[in-house]
Amino acid sequence: MALASIFAEFKGLAAGVSLDNINPLYVAGGILGAFTVYSIILVVYRLRFHPLTGFPGPKLLAATTWYEAYVDLIHHDFPERLAKIHEKYGRDFLTIKLIVVPRSPRFSGPIVRVSPHEIHVNDAEFFHTVFATEAKHRTNIIPPRGLGQEDSIGSTRSHDMHQLRRKPLDKFMGQRNIVRQQSMIHEEIRVLDQAMTSLKGNGKPVRLDCVFTSFTGDIVGRLACGEAPQLLQGKDFTPEWYDMIRGAARIIPVLRHFPQVGEITQKMPNWLVQALVPRSAGFRVLQMLGAERIARVRAEVADEKKGVEGGESMFHYLLRSDLPESEKISARLNAEATSFMGAGTYPTAATLIFVAYYILADPKIEARLKNDLKDVMANFDDEVPNWEKVEQVEYLQACIKEGLRLLRLFRRKARIATDIDLTYGGYVIPKGTPVSLSPYTMHMDPDVFPEPTKFKPERWLVEDLDPRMNRNLNPFLAGSRNCIGMHVAWAQMYLILATLFRPNKNYSLKLGECDESDVYPVVDNEFGVAKYDSRGLNALVV
């Protein structure tokens, strides 16, 4: 009876409540007050009671991610600021912990708390502890949201699910299979070389950035779906593709901190996305391209059961695999297509843009490269040499390594050890904590790379090569989640540069109206991007 009377009394009170008696200002004030109290409690917890409280670093970063969002969206230079944070808090770390650590004048201070939930370590020797193979420990990630790629291999949070999704493609994207399939790269090389020959002497600058982006887009299209979109054969090498990919990259900092923008735009019709958020339209185009080709491949695989010979592509492999049927639905494969087309196109093209600029800008580098390519490219008119032969040209290898180093994979990359605590310098990092390292700081460490901002291929050719150089160079990351497309990226870079800069061809390239600022990466959009008003890489074919 007591309980019934309480309910009756409550019902009577509720009946007396009228919306007319509610003051909107009081409601707004109550909500604001509750949010303020919650925020204060959250900050106090993060600064005083969080498991990462004892790690060095700025209190502002430990309290909130809003500062990083501000820097990413306004100044685009958080990696440089992170380097300064290491320099400042490293002195305290070394003094308090009494640990002797090799220090560089710029990147000192090996461990800092870089967000409320994340630890950043600036020590290349710790790289393979964090980016571990499955034999060492399992690794999760914090997946990006808002890109429409949440179900792709690269964005899969769980270690076990990542391995399940990746296993069918490890063989397809492995070095042996790329070597076996490199005839498709040779075919595109012929298209590229013939196009350059046809442009000789017309006096019109060629956008090499568009050339490289279209080349890599065609190769990725063939690998993914067995069919090239023929971007390289489009008018002026399809500059719309380059503009779309670069435009999509510009929205990444927004989606990094406000993924809801991407999630909302994915539900909008195409015309509305183009009108309201034009930079995100690039992701929509990638999704549409992927959806159309997946439907075609799905039909081909179905026909194989009727005795019709099918093609060979990433999606043929996935649809033929023993993956659960839930992993073969179009929505997930479309996420894979979007991720593969984006990640497989621009980073490789950006490296080619960067390396080609420095070769064209320095006659000594170009002359030496041509001389060293003389033998391996001698029979190019009859046969495009294999990637394995071209990569033996040490100076070309040095140019590509230097380009990958300077391209500056800006964004720090984090891994989460799910099963074990990690120990570094007297600190125990609890399992489940995101721990990140920055290829940027490893690639730009002046102790390892003197004059780190300069393009110096010869640094890789000295007899007493510092072993730390190869240790620090990690453009494709490492461990069980390393870049699945790195072998095709290497093959394209070697063969394209060898073709364009081989001696005794019937055309030459001359740098057009552009300078270093048009190619040098200064914006942190996951990978380094040149200034937004860049003129691109222009060259005359003479």
From Swiss-Prot:
Pfam families, per the entry: p450
Main location: membrane
Broad enzyme group: oxidoreductase
Keywords: Antibiotic biosynthesis, Glycoprotein, Heme, Iron, Membrane, Metal-binding, Monooxygenase, Oxidoreductase, Transmembrane, Transmembrane helix
Lineage of source species: Eukaryota, Fungi, Dikarya, Ascomycota, Pezizomycotina
Classification via InterPro entries: Cyt_P450 (IPR001128), Cyt_P450_E_grp-IV (IPR002403), Cyt_P450_sf (IPR036396), Cytochrome_P450_monoxygenase (IPR050121)
Gene (name only): sdnH
SUPFAM superfamilies linked: Cytochrome P450
Protein name: Cytochrome P450 monooxygenase sdnH
CC terms in the record's Gene Ontology section: membrane
Organism encoding this protein: Sordaria araneosa
